[in-house]
Amino acid sequence: MYKYLLFDIDGTILDFKAAENLAIKALFKKYKLIECTDEMVNDYAKINDKYWQALERGEMTKPEILVGRFVEFFKSINVDTSIASDFNKDYQLELGEYVVFEDYAIELLTMLKGKLNEDGSRKYRLLAVTNGTKIAQEKKIKTSGLDKIFDGVYISEDIGVEKPNVAFFDTLFMEEGITDKSEVVIIGDSLTSDILGGINAGIDTIWYNPHHKENTNGLAITKTIFSLRELDNRRCFE
C-alpha cells in the first residue's frame, strides 16, 4: 500500500498551459509589445519545452534556460531581445497570479487528505514535487491554497537538481525518512521528468496523460491514467 503520494504541480495539479497563456499576454501588454496571439504563445511553449528538456538532460543550467527561451522566442517574432532577462523575472511573478486547476485536481487532493486509517491516523502523506522556479512555485502554491493541502513541497531549485535526477528523490527520501520505496508513487504528466525520475528512483509511477500522448520513450510505466478522476478509487493506491 502506498503511503507517500508525490504529485507534480504544473500540468498535473495546475493547468500550466492556461496560466502560461494568460501570463505572457498580460506581460506583452505591460511591456507595450505587439499583440500576443494564441499561436504565438503556442510557439513559445514549444521553445520553452525544448529548453526545459535540455535542463532535464543536464545540457543547460536553469538561469540559461529561463532567459534563453525568451531570447529565442523574441527573435522569432522580431521583438527586442534585450528585455528577455527583465521579462523573465516579471514572468515568474506573473505566473503565480493565475491559478487554473486541472479537472478534478482539488477534489482529488481534498479526498486523499481526508483518508484515514482504522486508528484515525492519516492514510497518505501528500507531497508536491516540481522543477518550476522557486519564486513562481511558492507564489502559485500559496495563491491556490495548495499550501494547506500538501504536507511537503519539494522544489528543484531548493534541492539543487532537477527531476529526473535521482538525487532529487534521494533528498526527498532522506527528509521524509522513507526507507521502503514500495510505499511511494509519483503522479505526473511528464515522461522525461516525472516518470523517468520515478523509474530512476526505483518507485512506482502513474502517468497522467489527458492528451493521449504516445509513450515514445518506451518507459516501463506502472499505470497510465487519462483523467484524475481515475484516481478516485479506494483501491487505486493500495
Per-segment meaning from a language model:
Residues 34, 80, 115, 147-151, ...:
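Conserved H-loop
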Residues 1-5, 110, 127, 132-238:
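Asp-based, Mg2+/Mn2+-dependent phosphohydrolase catalytic module
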Residues 84, 90-94, 98, 121-123, ...:
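Conserved acidic, metal-coordinating active-site core of Asp-based
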Residues 28, 74, 116, 141, ...:
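Conserved hydrophobic residues forming the short capping helix/wall of the S-adenosyl-L-methionine
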Residues 66-69, 108, 168:
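Internal, well-ordered alpha-helical segments in soluble enzyme and binding-protein domains
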Residues 30-31, 77, 115, 119, ...:
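Solvent-exposed amphipathic alpha-helical surface segments
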Residues 2-102:
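N-terminal helical cap/lid subdomain that shapes the substrate entry/recognition surface
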Residues 104-123:
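Catalytic-core regions built around general acid/base machinery
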